[in-house]
């Protein structure tokens, strides 16, 4: 891994990285977020009983839309032509959580890590928004990159070193 920050130019100013000379390769990234809530709130999500509607369906669409808008939200991100975005949910009644996993893919000159992280984060925020009327104490946690592949730096899996 490089010790220098790629978004800082020689004069110390923030700048967008020039990716024009990078090879076009298939890039993939997986990210997660977790929403911890009251057990009753989780049951209302599971059985689609909240007044605002189908929480997981809306959160899925919000996460997909967020990945597509990542460059509008994070100033130095490149606008990307994503070929695939998915957002999936795992309801854990024992821990009263919704685990969100996002996946982004493209063939391009820069990675999709930020898009995957944005998808998982916005899906979590959407769950919070749709459930806050019954549970303002929810906690969004464990937002992280799980895995990425493609590009010059190769494969990364959380817990591993960059190869």
Curated annotation (Swiss-Prot):
It comes from the Bacteria. The keyword Lyase applies. Pfam families: MoaC (PF01967). It is an enzyme of class 4 (lyase). Its EC number is 4.6.1.17. One of its GO terms (molecular function) is cyclic pyranopterin monophosphate synthase activity. Homohexamer; trimer of dimers. Belongs to the MoaC family. This is Cyclic pyranopterin monophosphate synthase. The gene is moaC.
